[in-house]
C-alpha cells in the first residue's frame, strides 16, 4: 500500500543510506543523498501504463500520487490525491542543476531528462534488481513492481466544527 510516493533507483538508495546512518535530520539526509549521488548509476527499465510501453535508461522511476517528498522536493507538480490516477516520473538523467531546479523552483522539468506519464495501472521490470522504497520506508531490492490506483480506498473522517450542524 502506497499513499504518497514510491520509487526505484536513486531516491530509494538515498533512503537505504539514510537508514544506515546514525545521524538523523536534514544533515543526515543530505549526507545520504550526497553518498548516493556519488555512487549513482542508471538502470534499464521497461514499464507499461494503461496506454503505452516504454523502455529506457533511468536514474530513478517514481510512482507518485502526491506532489512532494517529505524533504520538500516537489517531484510531481501535477499530482492530485483525488484524481483517480497516479503519475509515473521517469528520471532519465540527474544533474546537479536539475536537482537544484526541482528543489528550489517551480520551473518545468527538462523533458530530455525527466518525463511524466499518468496512469491507473503500471507494471515495471528492470534487468537487474534495484533499490525500492514506499512512503519513505526502504523495501529492499526488486526487479518487478505492479501498481494500481484503488479509487476511494481511504475514507477520512474529521470532527464537525462548532459552526456545522450535526
Give each language-model segment a name.
Residues 1-166:
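Long C-terminal subdomains/extensions of small-metabolite kinases
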